[in-house]
Amino acid sequence: MGRIGNIIDRKSKQDAKKAKIYTKLARVISVAAREGGGDVEYNAALKNAIDKAKLQNMPNDNIDRAIKKGTGEGGSDQYEEIVYEGYGPSGVAVIVEVLTDNRNRTAGDVRHAFDKNGGNLGSTGCVSFMFDKKGQIIIEKEDHIDEETLMMVSLEAGAEDFISEEDAYEVITSIEDFHSVKEGIEKAGYKLLEANISYIPQTLSQLQSEDDIKKMNRLIDMLEDNDDVQNVYHNWEVML
């Protein structure tokens, strides 16, 4: 299934945890509004956060409250962005993005998740060189979608690559062109499954033992269940 398998597997898990996902998205929206103001016309980070929330069907009331909280109308918490790197079972590379109001608490929680599941938390840079940070847009395959037309729309909008896999199309962009490519695809009438700035693994790693597979799944679940964790990236090839 490759990278798309990883994404669809993550999406199905997220669908079962909507309330927690909304809490995390609200935090991102609040931070973006605090740092760049509440007007999406002048705040690309806020627009991206709201677009991501809408892809998850987050209610508009929740989005509005998060913006007001960020701009100081509804109270304000101070969060910092931290990226942790480490290894899962059998050396699987893992990157964890967090937004936290307590660095020590979050570091302890993340370290505990790695330690409990056959991995270890590493130092900055220990695995990030195995990934490329890119815009990643996923469109689910449907009968009415013509692959060649979608590919041309994507490339003409500025995409770097277009990949067709079993269940979905993957469009890769530079970070700078992410918003314009995303808008170009949406304006052409395509519905997006996901659209994010992501750490994309250069190569994928397979786990051979059932024990390692269980540990890796548990590691991902423990990290994603943490309210401070925004995104978990890895180079494990999930076999669906």
Swiss-Prot record:
Pfam families cross-referenced by the UniProt entry: TACO1_YebC_N (PF20772), Transcrip_reg (PF01709)
GO annotation terms (biological process): regulation of DNA-templated transcription
Coiled-coil segments on the chain, per record: none
Keywords assigned: Cytoplasm, DNA-binding, Transcription, Transcription regulation
Subcellular compartments: Cytoplasm
InterPro entries, sorted: Integrase-like_N (IPR017856), TACO1_YebC-like_2nd/3rd_dom (IPR048300), TACO1_YebC_N (IPR049083), Transcrip_reg_TACO1-like (IPR002876), Transcrip_reg_TACO1-like_dom3 (IPR026564), YebC-like (IPR029072)
One example GO MF annotation: DNA binding
Gene Ontology CC: one annotated term: cytosol
SUPFAM superfamilies per UniProt: YebC-like
HAMAP family cross-referenced by the UniProt entry: Transcrip_reg_TACO1
Family: Belongs to the TACO1 family.
Record's protein name: Probable transcriptional regulatory protein Clos_1778
Species this chain originates from: Alkaliphilus oremlandii (strain OhILAs)
